[in-house]
Amino acid sequence: MPKKIMTGIDVFDAAMERIEWVFDTFSSVCLSFSGGKDSTVLFHLMANIARRKKRRFSVLFVDWEAQYQCTIEHVTRLREMYDDITDTFFWVALPLTTVNGVSQVQPEWVCWEDGAEWVRQPPEDAITRASFFPFYQNAMTFEEFIPAFNHWFAREKGMVAAILTGVRADESLNRFM
């Protein structure tokens, strides 16, 4: 079982050092943003450093259609708040398949499914055209979409890119690996 190794630096300072390193090392950076607390903190930290370094970064937000309205409002607020340092905000509202933990009849669910009645409409500027991403396949899983997006993003930028995701290690010791 993995164990924490104390390094003598607090989590905030360590995060800031790592984000600084990312911006110093990679010419292209993207934040994988869920609208949750962990990725929100990372968004704020990245924005702080990006402004100081006069850098920009992209953001990937996968809109699951059936999300709390307050989450959608929060994502919209942060998008507007950091528009000056956002390269591209990829608000993805494409059919993606995910596990459905609220139904024994339908163990998988496809958000934004063609021909289905949607919980709400996607924002007008969301990515809803399947042809936007050359790698996209209808109803692919999130687990397929993310690595495909990462490879596409790096190729689009013509270089190696850094994709950051906000996850607290304390949620799972396996995340140290």
Model regions and ranges:
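ATP-dependent adenylation/nucleotidyltransferase module used to activate substrates
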Residues: 1-177
